[in-house]
C-alpha cells in the first residue's frame, strides 16, 4: 500500500455550494482544489445538466469560489482578472463577472465599493451581498495593529478587530447598495422567504462580543427591520423560515 504523502492532500477535490438554476434545468456548484503556491484553494464553477445528466466545467481561472445565478439563468461571481482591477480590489472594490452556462468568456459587468464575501439572488431580482467591512480601514497601519475589542483574532481570518460581516441589498441595474444594519453590527446566518430576510446579528463597538446575538426580520420591500429576539437575551440556534 502506498503511503500518504504531503502532496497527496493536494489531489483532494472539494464540492460545495450547489444551487438549482432559476429555470430548474441545471445545478451549478463549486469544486475547490488545494494550491501550494498560494497556500490556499483554487475554485471553479461546474454545471450538472439535469436533462442530459452531464457535468461540464464553466470557469478555469480558479477565482469563482463565491457566485450566484442571475434571474436570466447566467452566472455571476466576484473576481479581478486584470492588473488594474486587482489593484482596486486591494483597496476594497469588488467586481462582478458574468458568464453563460453554455460557455464563453466571462465579462466584467458591475462593481461595488465593498469587499464581497457572499452573494445570493433574491426573489425580486436583486442580490443579497455578504460584505466584510473594516471600520479601521482608513486608519489601519501596516506596521502594527490596534486591539480595542475581544475577540481581535479568528482562525483562518487573521486580525478581526473592528471588522464586521454586513448584509446589503444590491440592485445591479441601478447600482444601488442598501445596508441592512449599521457598520458596527456583525451579521450571521440568514434565511429568505418572499420579501422577508430573517437574520442573526450582534451590535457591538470597541468592547467584548457577546455570544447571544439577536434575531431580526428585515422587509426587503420597505427596508424596515423588526427585532424578534433582542441581543444578549437568550441563546439561539440555527433559525430559518
Predicted regions and their residues:
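Beta-propeller domains
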Residues: 30-51
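Conserved beta-propeller blade repeats
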Residues: 12-27, 61-78, 84, 113-128, ...
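Predominantly five- to eight-bladed beta-propeller fold
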Residues: 43, 85, 90-93, 132-168, ...
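A short helix->beta-strand "capping" segment at the edge of beta-propeller domains
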Residues: 1-13, 178-179
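Internal hydrophobic scaffold segments of catalytic domains
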Residues: 98-137, 169
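Short loop/turn segments that connect beta-strands within beta-propeller blades
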Residues: 49-53, 100-104, 171-175, 219-223
Amino acid at each position: 500500500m502506498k503511503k500518504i504523502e504531503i502532496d497527496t492532500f493536494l489531489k483532494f477535490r472539494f464540492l460545495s455550494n450547489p444551487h438549482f438554476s432559476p429555470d430548474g434545468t441545471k445545478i451549478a456548484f463549486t469544486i475547490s482544489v488545494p494550491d501550494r503556491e498560494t497556500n490556499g484553494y483554487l475554485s471553479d464553477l461546474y454545471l450538472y445538466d439535469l436533462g442530459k445528466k452531464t457535468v461540464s466545467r464553466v470557469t478555469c481561472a480558479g477565482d469563482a469560489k463565491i457566485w450566484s445565478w442571475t434571474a436570466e439563468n447566467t452566472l455571476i461571481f466576484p473576481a479581478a482578472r486584470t492588473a488594474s482591477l486587482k489593484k482596486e480590489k486591494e483597496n476594497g472594490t469588488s467586481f462582478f463577472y458574468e458568464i453563460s452556462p453554455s460557455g464563453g468568456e466571462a465579462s466584467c459587468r458591475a462593481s461595488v465599493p465593498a469587499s464581497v464575501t457572499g452573494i445570493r439572488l433574491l426573489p425580486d431580482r436583486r442580490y443579497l451581498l455578504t460584505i466584510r467591512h473594516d471600520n479601521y480601514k482608513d486608519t489601519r497601519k501596516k506596521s502594527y495593529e490596534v486591539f480595542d475589542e475581544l475577540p481581535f483574532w479568528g482562525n483562518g481570518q487573521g486580525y478581526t478587530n473592528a471588522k464586521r460581516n454586513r448584509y446589503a441589498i444590491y440592485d445591479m441595474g441601478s447600482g444601488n447598495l442598501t445596508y441592512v444594519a449599521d457598520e458596527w453590527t456583525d451579521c450571521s446566518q440568514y434565511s429568505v422567504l418572499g420579501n422577508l430576510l430573517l437574520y442573526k446579528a450582534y451590535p457591538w463597538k470597541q468592547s467584548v462580543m457577546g455570544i447571544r446575538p439577536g434575531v431580526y426580520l428585515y422587509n426587503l420591500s420597505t427596508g424596515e427591520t423588526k427585532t424578534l429576539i433582542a441581543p444578549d437575551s437568550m441563546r439561539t440556534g440555527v433559525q430559518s423560515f
